[in-house]
Amino acid sequence: MYISEISADNEEYDLWADWILHRRNAGSLEFKQRIMAEVERYADRVLDAAQLQPGMTLVDVGCGDGFLGLRGIKRAGPTLRVIFTDISARLLKTAEEKCIRENVREQCTFFIASAENLSAIADQSVDVVATRSALAYVHNKPAALSEFWRVLKPGAKISFAEPVFQDEALAVGALRAVIESNPKTAHNNLINLIYRLKSAQFPSDKDQMEHASFCNFSERDLLRMVQEAGFHEAHLELHIDVYRSLINSWDEFIGRSPHPLAPSPQQVMEQSFSVDEQKLFESVIRPAVESKTILDNERIVYLTATKHA
């Protein structure tokens, strides 16, 4: 029950904008501030690896609300040119409004474009192509990497920070196998509810995984695709962090989606759980959330590579 399926009857619905502007932080300003502190950390690692210099041109692919590109301008100064691209017109408008407020609009260009088609950008015209949580959701990653290669000058760099969700999907599949193979587990209502929630947010079998762009690849797959696109001097770091959840309240827990294509727990509960099931789920999970003992984990790939001169 991915968001794209839920909203299929609403042509005006923009799931990417809705996630970045609302569902990512459950509509909570305080939660958003905690999340953005983490986003800043990711963005700085991407920009550190990109080795931005004044006078360069940076392409922020899948720019969202423009955070990465604007961060680049703050670091490299008034001579950095940034090209913002996204498939969401609403997010591009949000990014442009931010640039206007920061008085840097003249340094910026905005294109509605997918990562696989950057035809608005000339061959060998940019110094850095950067992404943060964008390439992971691209269906044809080799085509996107080919476009990155095309627009980069000789000697220029790609720099990414991308989530790897494959293990989350495998965990859902493992939970499904346990339920199907163990009669006692199959009659455990709480385990079944957790499975139904997680399987609405992540694929639960091999076929679903293969067709889900955001979790059908590993860090090694991404490195291989970068090399096959012609890039050299590749460096990949997989960061796996387990930490106390940033979620501080029940409203934040049920309102937050773990990624743009996932429904929130509240959406799953309202559409798939009975009233009694909702009460059971909340009675067990809410105390753990409010005691702030819930642990989260993340797997982020940081990858840089160079187009040879």
Can you say where each PLM-predicted feature lies in the sequence?
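Class I SAM-dependent methyltransferase SAM/SAH-binding core
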Residues: 57-61, 65-118
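A short glycine-rich, Lys/Arg-flanked "PGG" loop and its adjoining helix->strand segment in the class I
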Residues: 142-157
